[in-house]
Amino acid sequence: MGKKAIQFGGGNIGRGFVAEFLHAAGYEVVFIDVMDSVINSLQQTPSYDVTEVSEEGESTKTITNYRAINSKTHEADVVQEIASADVVTCAVGPNILKFIAPVIAKGIDARTEERPVAVIACENAIGATDTLHGYIKQHTNPDRLETLSERARFANSAIDRIVPNQPPNSGLNVRIEKFYEWAVEKTPFGEWGHPDIPAIHWVDHLEPYIERKLFTVNTGHATTAYYAHKRGKKMIAEALEDPEIRETVHKVLEETASLIVSKHEISEQEQKEYVDKIVSRISNPYLEDNVERVGRAPLRKLSRKERFIGPASQLAERGQKFDALLGAIEMALRFQNVPGDEESSELARILKENSAEDATSQLTGLEKDHPLYSHVVERVSTVQQGSKSVL
């Protein structure tokens, strides 16, 4: 029998990142989703194209050998597919992990294969597979918890690839940047060894990869979006042509670089080259990346371990500089009531209905005695008072 991978999430990242590389590794991909339109399209279309875009031009790969199941209406089928799968991946958004965990738990519990299934969450969040693992354990019979590792192994991953808004009428086809990084920890697989997926960079310690990516790519991308939104710019590449925005982004990334260099023993030169590469990537006009797409979901982006508070809190604890990050945090707080983004409306409500202190605690999860807390309270208060900000 051929190799089989179950991919939760039939969206752009699921189709244009994860499935592309699973397909290239020789897996049949079974997409699982709850969106009727996505499942119907996948079921009715035998192939779709992934077009990789770079300054050198475009190249297109055709993806075939996939099926699709609606887990809302055909849960038993999903359980059976997981029971005989080699790999389970997901790209559903960190907030959705708790909703996919019950069916994955049932599928794992139904396994009789000797080799445990590899579970890899492909989300923009630190420790996403650990989070999913925790939810799966909650939905596993206590008598079966002790032997769970015989049926499944869970490995965290760091993913890095920009997927912009897609042109209208693209159907299942995905335009995506050519560059990618997919790092996955290999230690959880132990004596079984990791799955054979050549696109994955298998590592012993994932945290340096996750933090470097999250605190450089995601911090830089979101900083650009929030300053651009304040200035009424529509596209990320256009925003980075503005010398003031570009300089501000570099200042933010100098601060996160100082954390990454001191914490993870990455050389200053290596991190500087990484930062330059990232700024060049997000400046790519061929991606046609939209400011509102990059800025959406500000509540998640302002949370405790995310791209702003995560590095700023660690810098504050280490007594290092975090002024530019505070500016980015303020700009994120100003991303309110953006059409089509519920979190930006919720952010506006929280800032309107709470004191600066309560809003800071609610939005960032910072403890009141944390060295960053009072600085963020100040910025929250500034935004609440409608004061004009610099830049």
UniProtKB/Swiss-Prot annotation:
Protein EC: 1.1.1.17
GO molecular function: mannitol-1-phosphate 5-dehydrogenase activity
Reactions catalysed: D-mannitol 1-phosphate + NAD(+) = beta-D-fructose 6-phosphate + NADH + H(+)
One Gene Ontology cellular component: cytosol
Active site: K213
UniProt key word Oxidoreductase: yes
Entry keywords, A to Z: NAD, Oxidoreductase
Positions that bind NAD(+): A5, I6, Q7, F8, G9, G10, G11, N12, I13, G14, R15, G16
Source taxon at top rank: Eukaryota
BP GO annotations: mannitol catabolic process
Keyword match 4Fe-4S: no
Homology family: Belongs to the mannitol dehydrogenase family.
Alphabetized HAMAP family for the sequence: Mannitol_dehydrog
Role: Catalyzes the NAD(H)-dependent interconversion of D-fructose 6-phosphate and D-mannitol 1-phosphate in the mannitol metabolic pathway.
Subunit structure: Monomer.
The name this protein goes by in its record: Mannitol-1-phosphate 5-dehydrogenase
